[in-house]
Amino acid sequence: NKPLYIGLAWTDRPLGSAHEWQAQDQPVMSIHDKDAQWWEKLTQYKSVVYWDKEKTLGAPFVMFYNAAGRHPETDLKAERVGIALSKDMKKWKRYPGNPVFAHEADGTITGDAHIQKIGDVYVMFYFSAFEPSRKYKAFNTFAASYDLVHWTDWKGADLIIPSKDYDELFAHKSYVVKHNGVVYHFYCAVNDAEQRGIAIATSKPMGRSQVHFPEREVKNRRMVMELDKGWKTWLCDKSAYGHTDNAPTVV
């Protein structure tokens, strides 16, 4: 598979209606850039741009993105989170201290950062997958920081874990908003049939959704069928066809 890059698209039309956006021909970030770092040499994944009006790192726009790479000392392959800075969202400069957040275990994913500021603390909601300390495959949790660079991992219970028939395989990829006093935690839910959808957890009971996955497709299961109803057979004289291989088989 070809590696993924980070691109840029824009629109001058209202966001409330579905329409095609204009896209830049070339990526704004690529693993082939001269300043690409070791932790992103394999491929780049999801990005999110945080508008830091205080310019904590010297620029108003901070892009958090996760990428795959091998550690130059341990050779561990993992997905880690790094940042890049911009003044116009068109040209980006990688932070020299990348990655800013990672879990060093082979095959582990630390990704899809979603940044919110609560008081004077920056909160990074993120998902982790294939973490050897967990029995489940993917889950949502968070880390906190005062400067967008140094992050302290939450050591308490994970926020969202696989626990329902719609997210029993993966419960990951956070997007968190607070509206009218209620915190809504949207996330991607994947069940054992690999059906994928958007689920939500709330800070207080808000009822149940009426949306459901389609009935699961049954695979690799032996089925017994009765063939004695509605079937007919004919006895054909194969000699009439000159050669038995030419005779039709009718059931």
Regions found by a protein language model. Name each.
Residues 1-45, 50-108, 116-169, 178-213:
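Beta-rich carbohydrate-recognition and catalytic domains
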Residues 11, 65, 87, 111, ...:
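Intrinsic-disorder/low-complexity regions
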Residues 113-114, 174-175:
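Conserved beta-propeller blade repeats
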Residues 213-251:
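Extended carbohydrate-recognition surfaces in non-catalytic/accessory domains of CAZymes
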